[in-house]
Amino acid sequence: TVVVITGSNDLGRGNGEIHHEFSGKVVTSSVDENYIGAEVGSNNTAELTAFAEALRWCLKQGGEEEIVIKTDSQYAGNQATGKWKAKANRELVAHVQKLWKEVCELRKLSWEHVKAHSGHRWNERADHLAIRAATNDSPTSLSFWKPGQR
């Protein structure tokens, strides 16, 4: 699940405007056109897949402004940057690292860890989208969604 935010005030409460959001299940079939290397659907492959989707979105949008990806997954952030060595999900990690490098060639890119379940509005929105995608339910429209709502 990816929620793209612009204009966050960096006070840690997830203020700012949603620019784009998307969610879905982890693709594990190598014959699927959307396959990027996940062999199983797990929390880690979901976090890496979401990271990859955010990076792909950055590449499609173009632009020169700095990008900061905020995630509650230290695993995904550290795998994407190559700080941690992949022991599992190697093909998926390699794909994410390739995307990270591509975006870094175009603009300044970093990631920040956001504590999960701590009231960060947009992290809670991402959790809502992920749960709804996993259960094949449509997400609540942003107009009617409230933080903490599953």
Mark where each language-model region is.
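Polybasic, low-complexity binding patches
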Residues: 148-150
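RNase H catalytic domain
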Residues: 33-37, 51-129, 134, 142-146
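RNase H-like nuclease fold core
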Residues: 1-45, 49, 56-57, 132, ...
